[in-house]
A protein has these predicted regions:
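Short, well-structured alpha-helical segments in soluble
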Residues: 111-122, 127, 237-255
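Short acidic/polar active-site loop segments enriched in Thr and Asp
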Residues: 18, 66, 123, 189-190, ...
Length: 350
């Protein structure tokens, strides 16, 4: 291979490292470091291939910045605002200022923000929130982050490990399986699930874990009682209205009554409680309700809501540390377990 045709990607393949690692080893970075053994491997590969680094790329990689970009789906959702508070606190300790993008789950807006952060030479980008079952959109964002990291930036995510970056992974399935076991232990047998958007991977994982937990106990979930809806308070409200219309909520309905409703996030559960009250139903007297996340606003909800607690502010700090950490050749995955918190909305039956 002649030196006129050698690219940084060729060097990365020759050294057996990622493109981002090869870039940092050769171009340098004011923000990220490479382990000495990786740097030596990359430089040796570059020498073998007679690679000539690009002066402009080196200048950009070494440029200093105090910006950290944070992408969330909906900053009005306390789940994301609490993660953002953890990111902001960790960024401030590192002398950085957070630039926030609330994308309303729009993949195009995510890409545009990554491109903006690249132009502004932000030190790192964090993507917080579950992905959708959309290979094209996920790959496009992953490619944009590879390009960003190849120029010296750091990147990390909260959610599914689909973007090729260090990721804080929420153990959704095991958490909801445990919730199913504990509610079953309190006497609940017939459930409905407010399942969120059909292609949202976090919603799918939470539903799947709950369904598996019930099946293992010999109490299979009726598919007719799985209600897709928006991942919002209003989505939970409308989904509960549909269950009431089916006649399965409360003892006076036309169908076989359910014991409890599990909403795959807390804001949906809050909406479901409001819809139940609007229909003249008592929570938990007529129907028990549980959620997921333990968002901070639950302290104002009556009855207190059974949920799965996530350390949301700590998750924000963790993902910031990953985004700012020295480069690692393979993406690091940090699992976070949820903790079932039983409260007044799901009292023992009988």
């Amino acid at each position: 291979m002649s030196d006129m045709t050698v690219t940084l990607s060729d060097v990365a393949r020759e050294a057996g490292v990622s493109l981002a690692t090869a870039s940092r080893a050769i171009n340098g970075s004011a923000n990220r470091t490479v382990r000495p053994e990786l740097r030596e491997r990359v430089l040796a590969a570059a020498a073998r291939l007679r690679y000539s680094p690009d002066a402009n790329a080196q200048a950009m990689a070494r440029g200093r910045t105090t910006a950290l970009g944070l992408i969330v789906h909906d900053i009005a959702d306390p789940y994301f605002s609490t993660i953002a508070s953890g990111v902001t606190a960790a960024a401030e300790r590192a002398g950085l200022v957070v630039t926030l993008a609330s994308t309303d789950r729009d993949a195009g807006r995510e890409l545009a923000f990554v491109e903006l952060m690249q132009r502004q030479r932000a030190r790192a980008i964090i993507v917080a929130g579950g992905r959708y079952d959309d290979d094209t959109a996920n790959q496009a964002l992953a490619d944009a982050l590879v390009e960003y990291r190849s120029r010296g930036g750091g990147a990390a995510a909260v959610g599914q490990p689909l973007l090729g970056v260090d990721t804080v992974v929420i153990e959704n399935r095991s958490a909801t399986a445990e919730l199913a076991r504990q509610l079953h232990g309190r006497g609940y047998r017939r459930f409905a699930v407010l399942a969120g958007p059909p292609r949202h991977l976090t919603a799918h994982e939470r539903l799947d874990g709950f369904r598996t937990g019930l099946a293992d106990l010999g109490a299979p979930l009726d598919p007719d009682l799985v209600v897709p809806c928006a991942f919002t308070r209003d989505g939970g409200y409308e989904a509960m209205e549909r269950l009431v219309a089916q006649g399965v909520v409360g003892r006076g309905g036309s169908g076989q009554p359910i014991d409890a409703v599990f909403a795959v996030n807390d804001v949906m559960a809050v909406g479901a409680m409001a819809a139940a009250r609007a229909a003249g139903l008592d929570v938990p007297g007529d129907v028990a309700i549980a959620g997921f996340d333990d968002i901070i606003t639950l302290r104002d909800i009556t009855p207190s809501l059974t949920t799965i607690r996530l350390p949301l502010a700590d998750i924000g700090a963790m993902v910031t540390e990953l985004a700012l950490a020295p480069d690692n050749d393979a993406p690091r995955l940090v699992p976070v377990d949820g903790e079932v918190i039983l409260r007044d909305s799901t009292p023992p039956l009988g």
